């Protein structure tokens, strides 16, 4: 076999093996697709989840579970109303902690 052909063949094989594990398309898997825009009363919220940005979802997600019907609502983390709600919840928790 020609030495230059052997080198080309080796380079082709090496390049093919290097791309084997690279995903072709990255899927985004966020829990929240749409945001609840109406204001919420803090007392109506049973549980508040804050999911930080990750590789699977590039933005912060805030999910409120309502006390009355266990409905989950996605909240807009950029909204001023939600920022003040998070601040109020944080202050309430700090008062409870000994």
From Swiss-Prot:
InterPro entries: Chemokine_b/g/d (IPR039809), Chemokine_CXC (IPR001089), Chemokine_CXC_CS (IPR018048), Chemokine_IL8-like_dom (IPR001811), CXC_Chemokine_domain (IPR033899), Interleukin_8-like_sf (IPR036048)
Coiled-coil regions listed: none
Keywords of this entry: Chemotaxis, Citrullination, Cytokine, Disulfide bond, Inflammatory response, Secreted, Signal
Residues the record lists as Citrulline modifications: 26
A Pfam family annotated for this UniProt entry: IL8
SUPFAM superfamilies referenced in this protein's UniProt entry, alphabetically: Interleukin 8-like chemokines (SSF54117)
BP GO terms, sorted: adenylate cyclase-activating G protein-coupled receptor signaling pathway; antiviral innate immune response; cellular response to heat; cellular response to interleukin-17; cellular response to lipopolysaccharide; cellular response to virus; chemokine-mediated signaling pathway; chemotaxis
GO CC field: external side of plasma membrane; extracellular region; extracellular space
NAD found in the keyword field: no
Top-level division of the source organism's lineage: Eukaryota
Known partners and oligomeric status: Monomer, dimer, and tetramer. Interacts with CXCR3 (via N-terminus).
Biological role stated in the UniProt entry: Pro-inflammatory cytokine that is involved in a wide variety of processes such as chemotaxis, differentiation, and activation of peripheral immune cells, regulation of cell growth, apoptosis and modulation of angiostatic effects. Plays thereby an important role during viral infections by stimulating the activation and migration of immune cells to the infected sites.
Protein name: C-X-C motif chemokine 10
Species annotation: Rattus norvegicus
